[in-house]
Amino acid sequence: MTPHSTHVTLDHEGIIQPPAEFKERSKSKPNLADFETYSKMYKESIENPSKFFGEQALEHLSWDRPFDEARYPVSSEQDFADGDIASWFVNGQLNASYNAVDRWAIKNPNKPAIIYEADEENEGRIITYGQLLKDVCKLAQCLTKLGIRKGDSVAVYLPMIPEALVTLLAIVRIGAVHSVVFAGFSSSSLKDRILDASSKIVITTDESKRGGKTIETKKIVDDALKNCPDVTNVLLFKRTGNAHIPFTEGRDLWWHEEMAKYGPYFPPVPVNSEDPLFLLYTSGSTGKPKGIQHSTAGYLLGAAMTSKYTFDVHEDDVLFTAGDVGWITGHTYVVYGPLLCGATTVVFEGTPAHPNYSRYWEIVDKYQVTQFYVAPTALRLLKRAGTKYIENYKLDSLRVLGSVGEPIAAEIWHWYNDNIGRRKCHIVDTYWQTESGSHMLAPLAGITPTKPGSASLPCFGIDAKILDPVSGKELKENDVEGVLCVKSCWPSISRGIYNDYARFIETYLKPYPNHYFSGDGAARDVDGFYWILGRVDDVVNVSGHRLSTAEIEAALILHESVAECAVVGYADELTGQAVAAYVSLKSNVSEDLEVIKKELILTVRKEIGPFATPKTILLVDDLPKTRSGKIMRRILRKVLAGEEDQLGDISTLSNPGVVAQIIDVVKATRK
């Protein structure tokens, strides 16, 4: 063991090979033949990125004007050296909308592009590629008529309905830039993002539906626009048809009325490879919003390649990503990735628990979903509900099960594998970021061996390095722990923070010179598999021991009574920091709570060691989470620090009411 070794890599299960049934369930030949093919391609993507990605770009994308060279500079030796990011597909021109829609509409106009499952059961519709093209073209004409031109920003505040996809594709069809704001953000957060992106138009709905509840979407927009004088129009889709929705004459326009004015075709506007495609503001940040900017060609290639290789997507597949278009997962694996591959994408408006815990599995069987992609948070919820909600479903169309958003605990991995995959699907635990645009670490479906809890191996072009967090020295051997960085540029990397490139350099390129800094701790085990240990600011330093919160959480969840947990650090006079564990128990627990606390401490001592023992265990009803499923550890830290008045905007939480209960629990421990 090296001085930087990590306990999380002590995997007792060994390497799990892809199931033999994976290939049997596929209607098409797998996109990669074997692991040797991946290894050869990966090596070339690192050693000769210009040649590798040049060939991939010609294979996966249609070009209006061919690029002169795939990468400038051709060599990656000086990447990130002076805050510079390589340019990709120099002098090439293309259009994202054409690549995602037109070429498939021409080939097979009657093929389903979007399957829409509404919040209400048995409501929804199927949109073919031919119909999608018509809708996109009509909206593109509408936006042009309203004065939107190439490079302009359009704010999108829409729920998970097909019109969200139509909107994004129409915006990029005319060379404009979409800035999607998750339709759960408060009016204040929406206002900040509209102002920062200088958006001229907002596209939204009268109301939205989620989990059986009606959300007053338009009222939130109206409140935000009180302080956005440069917004000229609001385009309003009629989702519920509430006749009492506020409507501002001269500014507000009805979607259906505007769409009826235009014909079924509008030519796509070619843009340069490096022209911006979209802005997406990262969630959970404090202070000024951080608008991550992505380029057109590089992002599209990343979305297409990772969909094809990570998920083994083919044109005859149906991909169900249980994510929202307001986050990067929705952008890449609900919208662009599946459509760039000519597949069918499922757009689900609801929640996994409405009207009951069978909703996901009902959708899978109903539409013969082949790839399912979801956050571990949802899986924990469904595991707690019990297998009775799964037993009546075949789920035999599935061949790939994806996990996204946070590391998946081994216990949840096995539950997923046994109950949803029936041990016949390949589980791909993916690691990536808003800033990366597409997968960074992930198994490739049907190809890569896996270990429960590990993100496996780097994707093409990701020259992953683990650095010593203090010295910045690369830890080249296996069985090491440090910070995860990337040595060279890849096509889908963010091109910066909108209007603040200096902040981009400070955040991602300056901490470890000549590297992109992910912000995450990671380990590479004895077999070369990568494990994500959580954000570096989620690492707790107790008496000189650097403890990964993810590692402690993985130990706690082994206890049979634990449904969810989150570990954070807090100030301690003796040890510098101490470990606090917020624990949510399963609903059927009858055991004495003090006994459970003692058992949890023993579990951590057994799995990791005495130095990792939580000093405080707080039993709470639930944990604060965003709608995308991420646990908001920032809130948990602030409550522990007695900073309840500095929590910021909690309106984006899926369960904001839980914060008050958590505050009460913490206060009770101080008495």
From Swiss-Prot:
This is Acetyl-coenzyme A synthetase 1. Belongs to the ATP-dependent AMP-binding enzyme family. It comes from the Eukaryota. One of its GO terms (biological process) is acetyl-CoA biosynthetic process from acetate. Keywords: ATP-binding, Ligase, Nucleotide-binding. One of its GO terms (molecular function) is ATP binding. GO terms for cellular component: cytosol. Signal peptide: none annotated. PROSITE patterns: AMP_BINDING (PS00455). Its EC number is 6.2.1.1. The lineage of its organism: Eukaryota, Fungi, Dikarya, Ascomycota, Saccharomycotina. Disulfide bonds: none annotated. ATP binds at G405, E406, P407, D429, T430, Y431, W432, Q433, T434, D520, R535, R546. It catalyses: acetate + ATP + CoA = acetyl-CoA + AMP + diphosphate. It is an enzyme of class 6 (ligase). InterPro entries: Ac_CoA_lig, ACAS_N, AMP-bd_C, AMP-bd_C_sf, AMP-binding_CS, AMP-dep_synth/lig_dom, ANL_N_sf. The keyword NAD does not apply.
